[in-house]
Amino acid sequence: MSEDLFVSINFPNGKSVKQPIGLYINGEWHKSAETWETVDPSIEEVIAKVYLAGEKEIDYAVKSAKEAFKTWKKVPGSEKGELLMKLAELTEKHADTLAAIEAMDSGKPLVSNARGDVDGTIALLRYCAGWADKIYGQVIPTGPEKLAYAKRTPIGVCGQIVPWNYPLNMAGWKIAPALAAGNCIIIKSAETTPLSLLYFATLVEEAGFPKGVVNIISGLGTVAGSYMAKHPGIDKIAFTGSTKVGVIVQQLAASNLKAVTLECGGKSPFLVFEDADLDQAVKWAALGIMYNSGQICTSNSRIYVQDSVYDKFIELFKKHVIQDYIVGMPFDDNTVVGPVVNKTQYNRIKNYIEQGKKEGAKLVLGDEPLPLKQGYFISPTIFADCSENMTIVKEEIFGPVVAISKFKTEDEAIEKANNTTYGLAAMCFTKDLERAHRVSDELEAGMVFINSTENSDIQAPFGGIKMSGIGNELGSNGIEMYTQIKAVHINFNNKL
């Protein structure tokens, strides 16, 4: 193992790590002709340079995965489950290191955010390990002269593209079900946040996965991501990211009609009815837009409050955000809101804030100067009295910025909630059980949260409709997305 494929990284908490920077292909670490600087968004300094995969490296990864698939697909589900369980144990053993890498590379607060992401990855690995020997088909009754059955088989070589907002967690959502179902994978991190997934590759190796089954690469979306999406040797592509890029991925994937799973953008509405528990609505609403600095696809970035409790909600919401959502450095134990991921996102979010003010939204909180002299920090920002034609209401901002509006009737709330091209998630706060079911039926979203938000479960499907995506991750549905149906017909006595 070449030492120049690893670098030493020192964390602000005094600890350090031997960080891989190469391409993990066919069970070995490789260099390439191109490198990329990954930057700590809290201090705007380079952490490390990682090697980038180009077409040549991806071709090699596909070749390796195809060869490995010949034997991996035949490995009993129980053995696949054991390997995934071993990987979960190793991830748990290295959880503090992985969380520190995420905090430095993405700006996530270590205590309030990054460690929880790693714990979620561990839980999902164990969940999918349990599924590996329980992927059943069905026997179909056809009469005494024939037997027909359908079996779920692995798809083959799966390309997976991970976003920068949850580098390891979203990787786990793709890696675990794909392997449990018997596929081989080539997974690409976001170029902005490659480090935790590269470190995870060392755990894959230690767990004992056969060469070629798991290939982990860094690469530019415009180069490696595009090439993976259109590669004729890749049988499925799974992508999490913006809707704009998701559309491109689907177009490229059509070149060989590969299976596609897309988890894209959102502009989730959060409805607060007058009978709601306002204290709870305030706390959940804040969590749903300020956590992870608002960089969550399901963020409830639109809040609609019934007119009779509108002013009270805004008063409580502002007070709660000021008290509980402290902006600070990722390794500070008190920090809840860290920096956004890079300068591009920082400028983009700032432009949206200016647009909100320009279009007449009332700035209730935010846009104040922060004591931090460097880093891509944005203070929690609350706009009120927003109208449906405002840019901050229509477009995904992907930052700690929320637009609040009022409604009079249930029908008006539903109409406003559905007035978007997105359909990932929606939230409804009410004590009226009948209303909860009635409204959830009418909301155009792949997921509806009643009296909560951002508390999806690994056992339940996660996915959107409309321009928010295709297919699901998590739950049994997430496993099935990595399988295909094969129907087998057995003739007993039917002779010609």
From Swiss-Prot:
GO molecular function: aldehyde dehydrogenase (NAD+) activity
Key words, A-Z: Cytoplasm, NAD, Nucleus, Oxidoreductase
UniProt EC number: 1.2.1.-
Claim: NAD is one of the keywords in the record: yes
GO terms classed as biological process: aldehyde metabolic process; beta-alanine biosynthetic process; polyamine catabolic process
Annotated localization: Cytoplasm; Nucleus
Location, primary (coarse class): cytoplasm
Annotated positions for site Transition state stabilizer: 165
SUPFAM superfamilies: ALDH-like
Cellular component, GO, one term: nucleus
Active site, per annotation: 263 (proton acceptor), 297 (nucleophile)
Binding site residues for NAD(+): 241-246
Pfam family of the protein (one): Aldedh
Recorded family membership: Belongs to the aldehyde dehydrogenase family.
Protein name, as recorded: Putative aldehyde dehydrogenase-like protein C922.07c
